[in-house]
Amino acid sequence: MESVSEEVHGGADEDEQAESEEAMLWSIREALERQTLQIGVSACGATAVVDVLKALGVDVAPEEADRCVQTRMRRNESPLPDYLLSRSEAGATHTQLIAGAEEASKGKVIGRFFHLHPRRRVKLVPWLARWIRKGAVPVATMNMQLVVPKGEEVPDAWHHQLIFGVAPTTVFMTNPLDLVSEVEVHQRLCSESVLLIRREDVLQRLTPDCCMSSLSDPRWKALDVEGQVRQMVLEEEQGQGKLTHITIPAAYSSGITLFARLQSELGQELLNTPELPVL
Protein backbone atom coordinates (compact mmCIF):
# COMPACT_ATOMS: atom_id res chain seq x y z
CA MET A 1 0.00 0.00 0.00
CA GLU A 2 1.04 3.55 -0.67
CA SER A 3 0.23 6.12 1.98
CA VAL A 4 -1.68 9.18 0.85
CA SER A 5 0.36 12.35 1.17
CA GLU A 6 -1.37 14.78 -1.16
CA GLU A 7 -4.66 15.35 -2.91
CA VAL A 8 -5.07 13.92 -6.39
CA HIS A 9 -6.38 16.39 -8.98
CA GLY A 10 -7.81 15.32 -12.32
CA GLY A 11 -7.11 17.27 -15.50
CA ALA A 12 -9.89 19.26 -17.15
CA ASP A 13 -9.61 17.12 -20.26
CA GLU A 14 -10.53 13.83 -18.59
CA ASP A 15 -12.82 11.79 -20.78
CA GLU A 16 -16.27 10.56 -19.88
CA GLN A 17 -15.07 7.12 -18.83
CA ALA A 18 -12.55 8.52 -16.36
CA GLU A 19 -15.22 10.79 -14.89
CA SER A 20 -17.50 7.77 -14.42
CA GLU A 21 -14.78 6.22 -12.27
CA GLU A 22 -14.36 9.18 -9.92
CA ALA A 23 -16.37 9.89 -6.78
CA MET A 24 -15.44 11.21 -3.34
CA LEU A 25 -17.35 11.28 -0.05
CA TRP A 26 -14.57 13.43 1.42
CA SER A 27 -11.56 15.15 -0.08
CA ILE A 28 -8.24 13.81 1.15
CA ARG A 29 -7.88 16.90 3.34
CA GLU A 30 -11.32 16.26 4.84
CA ALA A 31 -10.48 12.59 5.36
CA LEU A 32 -7.31 13.55 7.23
CA GLU A 33 -9.35 15.78 9.52
CA ARG A 34 -12.44 13.59 9.92
CA GLN A 35 -11.20 10.00 9.94
CA THR A 36 -11.27 8.05 13.20
CA LEU A 37 -8.07 6.27 14.10
CA GLN A 38 -8.36 2.70 15.40
CA ILE A 39 -10.39 2.92 18.63
CA GLY A 40 -9.18 -0.31 20.20
CA VAL A 41 -7.68 -3.77 19.75
CA SER A 42 -9.46 -5.73 16.99
CA ALA A 43 -11.88 -2.78 16.62
CA CYS A 44 -11.34 -1.83 12.97
CA GLY A 45 -14.99 -2.69 12.30
CA ALA A 46 -16.30 -0.43 15.05
CA THR A 47 -13.88 2.27 13.87
CA ALA A 48 -15.33 2.04 10.37
CA VAL A 49 -18.86 2.28 11.77
CA VAL A 50 -17.98 5.54 13.60
CA ASP A 51 -16.87 7.06 10.29
CA VAL A 52 -19.83 5.63 8.35
CA LEU A 53 -22.24 7.31 10.75
CA LYS A 54 -20.20 10.52 10.66
CA ALA A 55 -20.38 10.56 6.85
CA LEU A 56 -24.16 10.07 7.05
CA GLY A 57 -24.59 12.90 9.57
CA VAL A 58 -24.99 10.78 12.72
CA ASP A 59 -22.47 11.46 15.49
CA VAL A 60 -21.82 8.53 17.82
CA ALA A 61 -19.13 8.14 20.48
CA PRO A 62 -16.51 5.50 19.59
CA GLU A 63 -17.29 3.59 22.81
CA GLU A 64 -20.96 3.38 21.84
CA ALA A 65 -20.12 2.14 18.35
CA ASP A 66 -17.82 -0.51 19.80
CA ARG A 67 -20.53 -1.63 22.22
CA CYS A 68 -23.09 -1.88 19.42
CA VAL A 69 -20.75 -3.75 17.06
CA GLN A 70 -19.82 -6.16 19.89
CA THR A 71 -16.17 -6.47 18.93
CA ARG A 72 -14.80 -9.90 19.83
CA MET A 73 -11.35 -10.18 21.37
CA ARG A 74 -8.52 -12.67 20.93
CA ARG A 75 -8.13 -14.97 23.93
CA ASN A 76 -4.35 -14.85 23.98
CA GLU A 77 -3.99 -16.67 27.31
CA SER A 78 -6.15 -19.64 26.32
CA PRO A 79 -4.90 -23.11 25.38
CA LEU A 80 -4.39 -23.63 21.65
CA PRO A 81 -7.88 -24.90 20.63
CA ASP A 82 -9.72 -22.02 22.32
CA TYR A 83 -7.09 -19.52 21.15
CA LEU A 84 -7.56 -20.63 17.54
CA LEU A 85 -11.33 -20.43 17.92
CA SER A 86 -11.01 -16.87 19.23
CA ARG A 87 -8.71 -15.94 16.36
CA SER A 88 -11.22 -17.24 13.82
CA GLU A 89 -13.84 -14.73 15.00
CA ALA A 90 -11.84 -11.87 16.59
CA GLY A 91 -12.96 -8.39 15.63
CA ALA A 92 -16.26 -8.32 13.76
CA THR A 93 -18.04 -9.62 10.70
CA HIS A 94 -19.97 -7.50 8.19
CA THR A 95 -23.16 -8.69 9.91
CA GLN A 96 -21.97 -7.16 13.18
CA LEU A 97 -21.10 -3.90 11.39
CA ILE A 98 -24.59 -3.67 9.88
CA ALA A 99 -26.32 -4.48 13.18
CA GLY A 100 -23.99 -2.13 15.07
CA ALA A 101 -24.58 0.80 12.71
CA GLU A 102 -28.33 0.29 12.91
CA GLU A 103 -28.34 0.13 16.72
CA ALA A 104 -25.89 3.01 17.22
CA SER A 105 -27.91 5.23 14.86
CA LYS A 106 -31.19 4.22 16.54
CA GLY A 107 -32.46 2.74 13.30
CA LYS A 108 -31.57 5.67 11.07
CA VAL A 109 -28.83 3.84 9.12
CA ILE A 110 -28.98 0.52 7.29
CA GLY A 111 -26.30 -1.53 5.57
CA ARG A 112 -26.27 -4.00 2.72
CA PHE A 113 -23.40 -6.43 2.14
CA PHE A 114 -22.30 -7.48 -1.34
CA HIS A 115 -20.22 -10.66 -1.55
CA LEU A 116 -17.21 -10.48 -3.85
CA HIS A 117 -16.18 -14.13 -3.39
CA PRO A 118 -16.56 -16.20 -5.47
CA ARG A 119 -15.44 -13.60 -8.02
CA ARG A 120 -18.27 -11.43 -9.35
CA ARG A 121 -19.03 -9.88 -12.72
CA VAL A 122 -18.25 -6.31 -11.67
CA LYS A 123 -15.76 -3.52 -12.37
CA LEU A 124 -14.98 -2.48 -8.83
CA VAL A 125 -14.12 1.22 -9.18
CA PRO A 126 -17.01 2.19 -11.52
CA TRP A 127 -19.42 0.19 -9.33
CA LEU A 128 -18.21 1.93 -6.16
CA ALA A 129 -18.26 5.32 -7.90
CA ARG A 130 -21.93 4.92 -8.87
CA TRP A 131 -22.95 4.15 -5.28
CA ILE A 132 -20.77 6.87 -3.75
CA ARG A 133 -22.26 9.48 -6.10
CA LYS A 134 -25.71 8.40 -4.89
CA GLY A 135 -24.58 9.02 -1.30
CA ALA A 136 -23.80 5.48 -0.11
CA VAL A 137 -20.87 4.94 2.26
CA PRO A 138 -18.82 1.80 1.46
CA VAL A 139 -16.82 -0.32 3.89
CA ALA A 140 -14.43 -2.96 2.54
CA THR A 141 -13.97 -6.25 4.42
CA MET A 142 -10.65 -7.60 3.16
CA ASN A 143 -8.25 -10.46 3.74
CA MET A 144 -5.03 -8.49 4.26
CA GLN A 145 -3.02 -11.73 4.12
CA LEU A 146 -3.39 -11.66 0.34
CA VAL A 147 -1.20 -9.56 -1.99
CA VAL A 148 1.54 -9.03 0.61
CA PRO A 149 4.41 -6.94 -0.84
CA LYS A 150 7.62 -8.93 -1.26
CA GLY A 151 9.80 -8.75 1.84
CA GLU A 152 6.97 -7.67 4.16
CA GLU A 153 5.60 -9.82 6.97
CA VAL A 154 2.22 -11.46 6.40
CA PRO A 155 -0.39 -9.50 8.41
CA ASP A 156 -2.17 -11.48 11.11
CA ALA A 157 -5.75 -10.32 10.51
CA TRP A 158 -8.50 -9.31 8.13
CA HIS A 159 -9.43 -5.62 8.05
CA HIS A 160 -12.47 -3.36 7.66
CA GLN A 161 -11.80 0.02 6.03
CA LEU A 162 -14.13 2.83 5.04
CA ILE A 163 -13.79 3.80 1.38
CA PHE A 164 -14.06 7.58 1.09
CA GLY A 165 -13.50 7.80 -2.64
CA VAL A 166 -12.35 6.24 -5.88
CA ALA A 167 -10.48 7.41 -8.97
CA PRO A 168 -9.49 5.46 -12.09
CA THR A 169 -7.70 2.28 -10.87
CA THR A 170 -7.43 3.69 -7.31
CA VAL A 171 -9.36 3.29 -4.04
CA PHE A 172 -9.09 5.78 -1.13
CA MET A 173 -9.51 4.37 2.38
CA THR A 174 -9.24 5.37 6.04
CA ASN A 175 -7.67 3.65 9.09
CA PRO A 176 -4.98 4.00 7.87
CA LEU A 177 -5.40 6.73 5.27
CA ASP A 178 -4.27 5.01 2.08
CA LEU A 179 -4.62 5.05 -1.66
CA VAL A 180 -4.50 1.50 -2.97
CA SER A 181 -4.62 0.11 -6.49
CA GLU A 182 -7.96 -1.27 -7.62
CA VAL A 183 -6.30 -4.59 -8.52
CA GLU A 184 -4.82 -4.99 -5.04
CA VAL A 185 -8.08 -4.13 -3.28
CA HIS A 186 -10.11 -6.42 -5.54
CA GLN A 187 -7.83 -9.38 -4.80
CA ARG A 188 -8.23 -8.86 -1.05
CA LEU A 189 -11.98 -8.50 -1.50
CA CYS A 190 -12.18 -11.86 -3.27
CA SER A 191 -10.99 -14.29 -0.60
CA GLU A 192 -12.12 -17.53 0.91
CA SER A 193 -13.09 -17.26 4.58
CA VAL A 194 -9.76 -18.43 5.99
CA LEU A 195 -7.05 -17.01 8.26
CA LEU A 196 -3.34 -17.78 8.51
CA ILE A 197 -1.97 -18.26 12.04
CA ARG A 198 1.76 -17.80 12.57
CA ARG A 199 3.95 -20.72 13.60
CA GLU A 200 5.06 -19.08 16.86
CA ASP A 201 1.46 -18.31 17.84
CA VAL A 202 0.64 -22.01 17.51
CA LEU A 203 3.70 -23.59 19.12
CA GLN A 204 3.82 -21.36 22.19
CA ARG A 205 0.28 -22.42 23.15
CA LEU A 206 0.70 -26.11 22.51
CA THR A 207 0.44 -28.33 25.60
CA PRO A 208 0.90 -32.12 25.98
CA ASP A 209 -2.81 -32.59 26.68
CA CYS A 210 -3.91 -30.40 23.77
CA CYS A 211 -7.04 -31.83 22.12
CA MET A 212 -7.73 -30.31 18.73
CA SER A 213 -10.73 -32.59 18.21
CA SER A 214 -12.73 -30.17 20.38
CA LEU A 215 -12.90 -27.98 17.26
CA SER A 216 -15.77 -29.95 15.81
CA ASP A 217 -17.06 -27.51 13.16
CA PRO A 218 -16.94 -29.23 9.74
CA ARG A 219 -14.86 -26.37 8.30
CA TRP A 220 -12.08 -27.15 10.79
CA LYS A 221 -12.20 -30.79 9.71
CA ALA A 222 -12.21 -29.84 6.01
CA LEU A 223 -9.03 -27.78 6.47
CA ASP A 224 -7.53 -30.55 8.64
CA VAL A 225 -6.38 -28.02 11.23
CA GLU A 226 -5.44 -30.86 13.59
CA GLY A 227 -3.24 -32.41 10.88
CA GLN A 228 -1.61 -29.05 10.16
CA VAL A 229 -0.71 -28.64 13.84
CA ARG A 230 0.70 -32.18 13.95
CA GLN A 231 2.82 -31.44 10.88
CA MET A 232 4.12 -28.24 12.45
CA VAL A 233 5.04 -30.08 15.67
CA LEU A 234 6.79 -32.84 13.70
CA GLU A 235 8.82 -30.27 11.76
CA GLU A 236 9.79 -28.55 15.00
CA GLU A 237 10.95 -31.86 16.52
CA GLN A 238 12.99 -32.60 13.40
CA GLY A 239 14.44 -29.09 13.29
CA GLN A 240 12.93 -28.35 9.88
CA GLY A 241 10.51 -25.48 10.45
CA LYS A 242 9.14 -25.30 6.90
CA LEU A 243 5.50 -24.58 7.75
CA THR A 244 5.32 -20.85 8.59
CA HIS A 245 1.53 -20.75 9.16
CA ILE A 246 -1.48 -22.98 9.59
CA THR A 247 -4.79 -22.16 7.89
CA ILE A 248 -7.98 -22.02 9.95
CA PRO A 249 -11.59 -21.08 9.07
CA ALA A 250 -12.52 -17.42 9.51
CA ALA A 251 -15.90 -15.97 10.44
CA TYR A 252 -15.53 -13.13 7.94
CA SER A 253 -16.74 -12.87 4.35
CA SER A 254 -14.89 -10.69 1.87
CA GLY A 255 -16.85 -7.96 0.14
CA ILE A 256 -18.31 -4.46 0.38
CA THR A 257 -20.98 -3.20 2.78
CA LEU A 258 -22.85 -0.13 1.55
CA PHE A 259 -24.50 2.07 4.18
CA ALA A 260 -27.25 4.66 3.75
CA ARG A 261 -30.03 6.32 5.71
CA LEU A 262 -33.06 4.05 5.98
CA GLN A 263 -35.63 6.75 5.25
CA SER A 264 -34.27 7.63 1.83
CA GLU A 265 -34.70 6.48 -1.75
CA LEU A 266 -31.10 5.26 -1.64
CA GLY A 267 -31.79 3.15 1.46
CA GLN A 268 -34.70 1.42 -0.24
CA GLU A 269 -32.70 0.96 -3.45
CA LEU A 270 -29.89 -0.69 -1.50
CA LEU A 271 -32.25 -3.12 0.18
CA ASN A 272 -33.81 -4.08 -3.16
CA THR A 273 -30.62 -4.39 -5.23
CA PRO A 274 -29.80 -7.99 -6.24
CA GLU A 275 -26.50 -9.65 -5.42
CA LEU A 276 -23.67 -9.15 -7.89
CA PRO A 277 -23.65 -12.01 -10.44
CA VAL A 278 -21.00 -14.69 -10.07
CA LEU A 279 -18.47 -14.96 -12.91
For every predicted segment, state its role:
Residues 4-12, 73-203, 207:
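Conserved active-site-adjacent core of cysteine acyl-enzyme catalytic domains
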Residues 9-120, 210-211, 221-224, 228-235, ...:
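Cysteine-nucleophile protease catalytic domains, especially the papain-like/related folds used
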Residues 5, 154, 166-279:
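Noncatalytic regulatory segments and standalone regulatory/sensor domains
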